Amino acid sequence: MAKNRLDDRGTRRDRFHQKAKKEGFAARAVYKLEEIDQKVSLFETGDRVLDLGCAPGSWLQYARQQVGETGILVGLDRPVGINAMKALPHARLLSGDVMTVKLEELKGELSGFDVVLSDMAPDTSGIRSLDQSRSEALFERALEIAQAVLSPGGNFVGKLFQGPDFKKLMEAVRLTFDKMKTVKPASSRQISIEQYVVGLGFKGANK
């Protein structure tokens, strides 16, 4: 029975991998963002989008489809990730560490972003508590950046491993946005502790 469940999960993951390859996306993670977007309507034509931890690029590819030619895309990741990515039309790719990057570098000439995305996950150690703590630190930094660069009314999506501070971080999103939702996409592994926390309608930096 256990082997059958493992086989089912492997087939399921492979199905999304093959679908992404067939449709020209850089990774199966694209279907997580697609499902989130279908549930909450993240994007509008012409939006300015910041993707934190953007490699290998499937979320930027999906965002491009949603915001159209007039939209602006900015992606940030570590050098090893950026260097391995294929060129993305109309996207500005920045090489750097999300924990130390300067906000001015992210914004460039823009007054702000309409959507901030983060599919960042830590390099897992296999130690559950350590991985949760690292995920929480990445999520907290992504939220901090979103609070600094989002325009009023903007949206945020961040991946978070469920851990001791999960509720506290969700409350931080509730205080920052008009609406907060959590989504566990169908393309996520059933045994995964990841959740996507969504903030809709940024209240503004002074609220």
Model-based region annotation:
Residues G163-K207:
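Class I S-adenosyl-L-methionine
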Residues E69-T70, L150-N155:
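Short glycine-dipeptide loop
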Residues L76-S118, P122-D123:
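S-adenosyl-L-methionine
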Residues T124-S135:
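Glycine/threonine-rich flexible loop motifs
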Residues T45-A55:
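Conserved class I S-adenosyl-L-methionine
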Residues E136-P152:
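A short glycine-rich, Lys/Arg-flanked "PGG" loop and its adjoining helix->strand segment in the class I
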Residues M1-T45:
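Class I SAM-dependent methyltransferase Rossmann-like catalytic core
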